[in-house]
């Protein structure tokens, strides 16, 4: 009888502790995010479009078809600059190309990016200070 009570008590204790050690406690949802950096081109006259490249992959060039080619790199013009959107990567450097209204290249440079990475256990978007391009 005492042995049965001890087994039952041990079983209840293990069952109670099992809730504290769930294998899903640190499970991350199956989501992704985009990293982005803003580029200020206000010091460079005549900029009408921006393209950027990470290694051999580039955002759409100005004047090109922008249908979905599967690229996760793109550029949006916003009030405070050009927002360069990447996939979940955070490259240390990117190539930035500036174009005039006739889609002629007026400046190309490689720019370093200093990212601040999320400390969330599941990751998250990285942030970077605005890149200010000089003429």
Show where each model-derived region lies.
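Extracytosolic low-complexity repeat regions of secreted or lipid-anchored proteins
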Residues: 77-134
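C-terminal motif of bacterial Sec signal peptides marking the signal peptidase cleavage site
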Residues: 16-19
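Bacterial signal peptide processing site
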Residues: 21-23
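Tryptophan-paired
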Residues: 48-100
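Extracellular/mature segments of secreted proteins
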Residues: 36-37, 61-68, 128-133
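Short coil/turn motif common to extracellular beta-sandwich-like domains
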Residues: 29-38
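Bacterial N-terminal signal peptides that target proteins for export
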Residues: 1-8
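Structural motif
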Residues: 40-45
